Amino acid sequence: MRREVSAVVAVAALLALGGCAMNPVAPLPTGAELDVDLDVGPRASFVDAGPDGVRVVDGDDWTLPDRVRPAEHSGLFSEEASADDLVAVRSIDLSWRQVQPEKGAPIDRAATGEAQGMSFDGLDAQLGEPGAFWMRLFASGADWAPEWVAEDCAVDSYGPDYDGQRHLPIWDECVWGHLMDTYRALFADTGLAADPRLRFVYVPGAFTWAEYDYEMVTAAVEAGDLDEESYLAWYAHAWDDLVELFGENAHKLVFTGEDYPFGPFGAADDLLARQAVDAGMGVRTGITELANFHLSEAPAYRSSIQPDGHLVVDESLPIHSGDFVVATENECYTDCGYQTDDPYYSVRQSNLKALQLRMNWMYVVPGPSYMAEYPEHWDWVRLSLGQTAETSADAWAAFRDAEDRYWGEEEFPRAWDDQPWVRNLERWLVQVDEPGSVAHRTEVDTHVADLEEDNGTAHEGLSTSVADGDTGFVLDVDERFAAASDGQGTVLKVTFLDTGNGAFRVETDAGDSASVVRTGSGEWRTATIALPEGAVGADASRLRIALEGIDGVEAATADDLVVRFVRVIRTD
């Protein structure tokens, strides 16, 4: 029988009255302000088109206009704040055993704790540190949970997990009820949920690293102790319990599970992450480092694969309203058991994937995340997180074909012409195939099994094919971005492989741009191209990168052009 979560409705009412509890508790410690100004624009000077309408630089160009500032409700977070890296949100980590070692006892705010090989100061000591914070309550581990829980609920632990830890079954109604009592005492009764310094909380506090995977669920099923019906019955109310408990602060809850988990229930568990989000929580993934794998079809983020292989994000739904946390973690490139020979490539692609999913928060560790090595790129990421089509300074498309190996063996629920190949990563700018402008796969920049085998093969860049009559690339600008660009200056940044003869220009309804002449350097270069006035606006959203031949006119005499990345930028 379900153990009822006590006093949930009453708590919601109390939260609405300001977070007071039935019994007075000592005020929470208030740390000093962190000495860091987050309202900082680009740290690198913007590369404009210059007086001739075209400026070309070597390599990638991540620069943004000086006016750009971070989006509200967005940022970088980590275990420790780093003012130099503009990481201003630190963690407060606790174990369940630490804060409630005795059944029915008040929250112990002085006791220390440990989990995952980490040692934690007491709650009050951590609250007394400067700056905003995010939180994890490590709850499920047999060594994280209070000893009395397993005895009171008469449950066994499962495991070990891949980190050697055994876990209690939090889906057990008795265990879950006790955990909800602790969440209520910790976050509602103390007023911690309403603390403006608290940015968000990872929930539910299970399993390895408090990340909700299905390794332990599968172990319980294989042991004969759990079936689909029982699990889904618990799951159906679990997230409502948390949302109701947090009340008006429920937007701070972040579910740590994933779409299409590697679970034991087949199709029955495919969409459970979306169910948690639909209950009124944010969501987080921890594996955008594997930028090609398992996150193309992501219902919790409202990202879906189209029949032509492009990815579309439905931003009309609450998860992308700006009120919720949509987070990822990008720090495992030459860490966490991963390895790459090209860390810049790995960092770049993982961040493009995160932004394609419209993330507003990103966990980083400055060293392993290579922030010092690639400062301009990370600055662009910081200023892109949480932006919308209306507020973003740029819209972009990364031209590529990459296989999502998860769907190499799974049956996809809809039409997908070239399964498992995904075309491009796009954010308010879509590359469109049409007669005379069909983009072709190229092998000039191919990566295989970057970080690990699951990441598959990726062909970076797409090519024209003069022999097939395809002499350009058509771009469709999101109508919201275009409308917000009305009356503003715009440039197009095109990262291209500087090989072959000929030039290219940008064709718009307002006229053509100046030409970019290839020099045959054999390197990736980025051209910043001034667009004619009115090229992008409420009634103008189509652009075409067009080849020019040796004579400057006849495209058929040009060599093929490979393009890897395109950005439309509002300069005003």
Regions found by a protein language model. Name each.
Residues 526-563:
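Extracellular beta-strand ligand-recognition surfaces/modules
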Residues 400-483, 560-567:
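Glycan-recognition and processing domains
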Residues 31-95:
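Boundary/entry segment of secreted carbohydrate-active catalytic domains
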Residues 134, 279-426:
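Substrate-binding cleft of secreted/luminal carbohydrate-active enzymes
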Residues 84-161, 178, 187, 191, ...:
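Aromatic-lined substrate-binding rim segments of carbohydrate-active enzymes
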